[in-house]
From Swiss-Prot:
Quaternary structure annotation from Swiss-Prot or TrEMBL: Monomer.
Compartments it resides in: Cytoplasm
HAMAP family: IF_3 (MF_00080)
Cellular-component GO terms for this entry: cytosol; membrane
Phylogenetic classification of the source organism: Bacteria, Bacillati, Mycoplasmatota, Mycoplasmoidales, Metamycoplasmataceae
The keyword Cytoplasm belongs to this UniProt entry's keyword annotation: yes
GO biological process, one term: ribosome disassembly
Name of the featured protein: Translation initiation factor IF-3
Length: 199
């Protein structure tokens, strides 16, 4: 299948069918307020929609054709608005990088872990990249141990997306993302501790 055909097929798949363009003789009709009206012929459903000065919109074909009475103009506007908000939300999620070395000292490791915690709590995803220098590459287990020690400092608010993997024979990379459930628990416990300290 050519790229043009694939694009056309995708466009047809995403096309919203409404009113006379609906290809089914019968549909399960849902009112604008979500009320289940029941099975109607397309003509009956169209008459009801026109009577309310609304559109008949096909919202599903599996396991049966389902159509809903809607103000299509408003429906289209709301859908575009929602898609835009989702896109903006995805854009706001930053991918940050934290660099480590196999022989990093405890103080430096804790400092970088603290910075990582701040980023995770903001919702950022983190790439932890450990760089081997010279003969250090022969001691891959040392790098794994360092990454494990680093993760121990953030595991109460994070999850590992991708386990440590060697890239370009020099970099041992691990990917982390914020864990919403863990963060909620952490913030709750932190709030309780603050309340105790204020007493």
């Amino acid at each position: 299948m050519s790229n043009t055909e694939q694009h056309q097929k995708k466009g047809q798949k995403n096309k919203v069918l409404l009113n006379n363009d609906i290809p089914f003789s019968k549909v399960f009709l849902i009112g604008e307020d979500g009320e289940k009206i029941g099975i109607k012929t397309k003509e009956e459903a169209l008459d009801i929609a026109r009577g309310e000065k609304k559109d008949l919109v096909l919202i599903s074909v599996q396991p049966k054709p389902i159509a809903r009475i809607l103000d299509y103009g408003k429906f289209k506007y709301d859908r575009k608005k929602k898609e835009k908000e989702q896109k903006e939300k995805q854009t706001n999620i930053n991918n940050r990088q934290i660099r480590l070395t196999p022989l990093i000292g405890d103080h430096d490791l804790l400092t970088k872990a603290k910075k990582t915690r701040e980023l995770l709590l903001k919702g950022d995803r983190i790439k932890v990249s450990l760089k081997f220098k010279g003969r250090e590459i022969a001691r891959k287990e040392l790098g794994i141990d360092t990454l494990n020690r680093f993760y121990e400092q953030v595991e109460d608010i994070a999850k590992i997306d991708k386990e440590p993997k060697l890239n370009q024979d020099r970099f041992l990379d691990m990917y982390l993302h914020p864990d919403k459930q863990k963060i909620a628990k952490y913030l709750k416990e932190k709030g309780e501790d603050n309340a105790k300290n204020e007493k």
